[in-house]
């Protein structure tokens, strides 16, 4: 685990592509710049999709744990 301060948590366990990224986008849209979203997922596609989403949308992927499920991603909202 990490010491990153989490502002919101999004549980996408049991959901499959494209739902985890769609819910991430919807959730982060309502957050303030600089806030951190913890995404919990078990869809293997998120190991590719969440980092790509962050890069495309100018959010910062602070950390990820993808060795075992559930996967965890800490995303800091950009502009």
From Swiss-Prot:
Family membership: Belongs to the sulfur carrier protein TusA family.
Transmembrane segment boundaries: none
Name of protein: Sulfur carrier protein TusA
InterPro entries in the record: Sulphur_carrier_TusA (IPR022931), TusA-like (IPR001455), TusA-like_sf (IPR036868)
GO cellular component assignments: cytoplasm
Molecular-function GO term, any one: sulfur carrier activity
SUPFAM superfamilies with a match to the protein in the record: SirA-like
HAMAP family, per database record: Thiourid_synth_A
Compartments, as annotated in UniProt: Cytoplasm
Role this protein plays: Sulfur carrier protein which probably makes part of a sulfur-relay system.
Gene: tusA
Origin: domain of life: Bacteria
Pfam families in UniProt: TusA (PF01206)
Residues at the active site: 17
GO terms, biological process: tRNA wobble position uridine thiolation
Keywords: Cytoplasm
